[in-house]
Curated annotation (Swiss-Prot):
HD domain residues: 327-420
Protein name: Ribonuclease Y
EC number: 3.1.-.-
GO biological process, one term: mRNA catabolic process
Protein's cellular compartments: Cell membrane
Record's keyword annotation contains Glycoprotein: no
């Protein structure tokens, strides 16, 4: 048993040794094979890397050679350009030197010629001085006097020629514009017809008997005082039979007083408390009538979108007048004229009619009386959001501001047409006479005027001049100067025609 165990152990040991020897031998062979393969692969990789590096080197070398060649080419081109520029500069320098030499020669020649000219000028001055002395001796005039006479002669000749040119231009303008302007204005006037009103500051209230007059006066005049205090109207009770005079510059107040008196007389109860009650009631009625009149006017004219306060102002125009012409009728007439004229000129007739109706709203309000009515009307229109062109037409229709819209001259012309229409307006006698005298005196202030006559109610001024002081050409200048001075210094409705008359009479006697 023991022998068997020992033999087994010995066999195991011998087998292990043999196995170790065989394993070691096989591992070595495998190691050698792997090593050979690694060496072979390394050799291949080495060759490949060497080839790759060599290829990159060759490529970089080729690129560098190209870049060097390109740089050399650019350098060569730059050198060629530089050489060309040097050649051009050299040529220019030679040309400059040549021109400088020519300029020096020309300068020397000019200096020589200037010397000759100076000598000749001195000789001419001497000759001219001698000739002037001879002419002065022959004519008896100095050189300055002769110059003055020549200048005056040339001035007169220039004035005559200028006036002739002006006349030709004006005649041509009249021929081309007069027919069309007359057609538009005449057609506008013919298509508009309104009634005429008379300005007055008093209203006569008719009564049936003096008994009623006494009741109106009241005990110790208390009814009269109450009525005057309530209406702001002066009530004149005199010996005029069956009449009481209501005096006030405000037509609305007079109308309120008239209507209140009518109701009091009709009712029969006349005492201070009743007077105050009736006046308050009538004032409310008149205010309602004013608004109704404004609305009716805008509807008749086809004007919409007006501010209520502007409608009220238009209604109050019924009780206002200017130079005897009812303000509302004047505004309606101007509005219709503006619409017709705007249509003829290809403009918006509705806007023109609106501007024409509103152009005199500045005459109605009592505030800011120091402002001209055109500017006050423009402020009111701006306040109540009217369009800028309409506001400008209102403010510029008397030339207080510059006209910036096409509506402005239309409103100005139509306002003048309405005011200048025969029978449309009247003036106070004193103001009328004063205006005629001012017209005549203004024309008399010009030299050469001998007489002046204002005719046709001041719409024409005839100026008679001395034939020995003013010639035919100067008469036209004089008429223009007088017209301009009248425009600048005087206020008048419509237009004034200035006619200058120059008459020469030769009288001889046969014996």
């Amino acid at each position: 048993m023991l022998v068997t165990i020992v033999a087994s152990i010995a066999c195991f040991i011998v087998g292990g040794i043999l196995s170790y020897v065989l394993f070691k031998y096989g591992l070595k062979a495998k190691y050698d094979n792997v090593l050979k393969e690694a060496e072979t692969e390394a050799e291949v990789i080495k060759k490949n890397k060497l080839l790759e590096v060599k290829e990159k080197f060759l490529n970089k070398k080729a690129d560098l050679e190209k870049e060097v060649a390109l740089r050399n080419q650019k350098i060569q081109q730059a050198e060629n350009k530089l050489k060309q520029r040097e050649m051009v500069l050299s040529q220019r320098q030679e040309e400059i030197q040549r021109k400088r030499a020519e300029a020096d020669a020309v300068r020397e020649n000019l200096e020589a010629q200037l010397g000759i000219v100076d000598k000749k000028k001195e000789e001419l001055d001497k000759l001219q001085h001698q000739e002037i002395e001879k002419l002065e001796a022959l004519s008896g005039l100095s050189a300055d006097e002769a110059k003055e006479r020549l200048v005056e002669s040339l001035k007169e000749e220039a004035k005559t020629q200028a006036q002739s040119y002006i006349n030709d231009i004006m005649d041509d303008a009249k021929l081309t514009a007069s027919k069309e302007a007359k057609r538009i204005v005449i057609q506008s006037i013919q298509r508009v017809a309104t009634e005429t009103a008379i300005e007055n500051s008093v209203t006569v209230f008719h009564i049936e008997s003096d008994e009623i007059k006494g009741r109106i006066i009241g005990r110790e005049g208390r009814n009269i005082r109450a009525l005057e205090a309530a209406t702001g109207v002066e009530i004149v009770v005199d010996d005029t039979p069956e009449a009481i005079v209501l005096s006030a510059f405000d037509p609305v107040r007079r109308e309120i007083a008239r209507l209140a008196l009518h109701q009091l007389v009709t009712d029969g109860r006349i005492h201070p408390a009743r007077i105050e009650e009736v006046v308050a009631k009538v004032r409310k009625q008149v205010e309602e009538e004013i608004i109704e009149t404004g609305k009716r006017t805008t509807i008749d004219l086809g004007i919409h979108g007006l501010h209520p306060e502007l409608i009220r102002i238009i209604g109050k125009m019924k009780y206002r007048s200017s130079y005897g012409q009812n303000l509302l009728q004047h505004a309606r007439e101007t509005a219709n004229l503006c619409a017709v004229m705007a249509s003829e000129l290809g403009l918006n007739p509705k806007k023109a009619k609106r501007a024409g109706l509103l152009h005199d709203i500045g005459k109605v309000p009592d505030e800011e009386p120091e402002l001209p009515h055109a500017l006050l009307g423009m402020k009111l229109a701006e306040k109540f959001k009217e369009k800028p062109d309409i506001c400008n037409a209102i403010g510029a229709h008397h030339d207080e501001i510059e006209m910036t819209s096409l509506l402005a001259p239309i409103v100005q012309v139509c306002d003048a047409i309405s005011g200048a229409r025969p029978g449309a307006r009247r003036e106070i006698v004193e103001a009328y006479i004063k205006r005629l005298n001012d017209l005549e005196q203004l024309a008399m202030s010009y030299p050469g005027v001998t007489k002046t006559y204002a005719i046709q109610a001041g719409r024409e001024l005839r100026v008679i001049v001395g034939a020995d002081k003013i010639d035919d050409k100067q008469t036209e200048n004089l008429s223009g100067e007088i017209a301009k001075k009248i425009q600048d210094e005087m206020t008048y409705p419509g237009q004034v025609k200035i006619t200058v008359i120059r008459e020469t009479r030769a009288v001889s006697f046969a014996k």
